[in-house]
């Protein structure tokens, strides 16, 4: 397996089964793939479908579990648990907008996620948002969700459009 490849010498063997490292993902709980000089093979991107200015105290998401600590801009992503994003991801789980970390706020719904855009006040509808990939390791998202990266990459359904590149 991938962990064994990193931890043991294989000069005397004819074959190995690399597993998760083929995705560019670390097999170790305390490391990301880039720490091991692996390149992620999956870059998941969504887009902002709405940007709203909310007032301090307004609630976001099902069950009103998150309230705006101040007047702020909130973005809505076209992404949810129906697209393979983990429903149990908590507020604070990171996304990247223009290279800036923006936190998930409220609950993940089937088709949408709300994010805090205070770090990217100029972000607008159509803006690309990195869910995970080169600059936001899937291992980090998995740690926020309390799962493993393998589960996240294997749960991406065909409902989400795939763009294959070499």
UniProtKB/Swiss-Prot annotation:
Gene Ontology terms for molecular function: alanine racemase activity; pyridoxal phosphate binding
Catalytic activity: L-alanine = D-alanine
SUPFAM superfamilies registered for this protein in UniProt: Alanine racemase C-terminal domain-like (SSF50621), PLP-binding barrel (SSF51419)
Active site, UniProt feature: 62
Cofactors demanded by this protein: pyridoxal 5'-phosphate
Record-linked Gene3D superfamilies: Alanine racemase, Lyase, Ornithine Decarboxylase, Chain A, domain 1
Name of the top EC class for this enzyme: isomerase
Keyword Transmembrane helix: no
GO-annotated biological processes: D-alanine biosynthetic process
Any one Gene Ontology cellular component term annotated for this protein: cytosol
Coiled coil spans: none
Top-rank taxon: Bacteria
Pfam families registered for this protein in UniProt: Ala_racemase_C (PF00842), Ala_racemase_N (PF01168)
Functional note: Catalyzes the interconversion of L-alanine and D-alanine. May also act on other amino acids.
Family affiliation: Belongs to the alanine racemase family.
Protein known as: Alanine racemase
């Amino acid at each position: 397996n991938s962990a064994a490849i990193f931890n043991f010498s294989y000069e005397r063997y004819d074959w190995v089964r690399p597993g998760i490292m083929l995705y560019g993902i670390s097999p170790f709980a305390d490391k990301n793939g880039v720490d091991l000089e692996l390149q992620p093979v999956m870059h998941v991107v969504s887009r902002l479908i709405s940007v709203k200015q909310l007032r301090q105290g307004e609630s976001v998401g099902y069950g009103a579990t998150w309230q705006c600590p101040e007047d702020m801009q909130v973005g809505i992503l076209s992404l949810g648990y129906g697209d393979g994003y983990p429903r149990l991801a908590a507020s604070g789980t990171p996304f990247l907008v223009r290279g800036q970390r923006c936190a998930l706020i409220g609950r993940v719904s089937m088709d949408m996620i709300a994010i805090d855009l205070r770090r990217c006040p100029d972000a607008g509808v159509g803006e690309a948002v990195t869910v995970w990939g080169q600059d936001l390791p899937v291992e980090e998202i998995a740690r926020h969700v309390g799962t493993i990266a393998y589960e996240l990459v294997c749960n991406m359904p065909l409902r989400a459009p795939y763009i294959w590149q070499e």
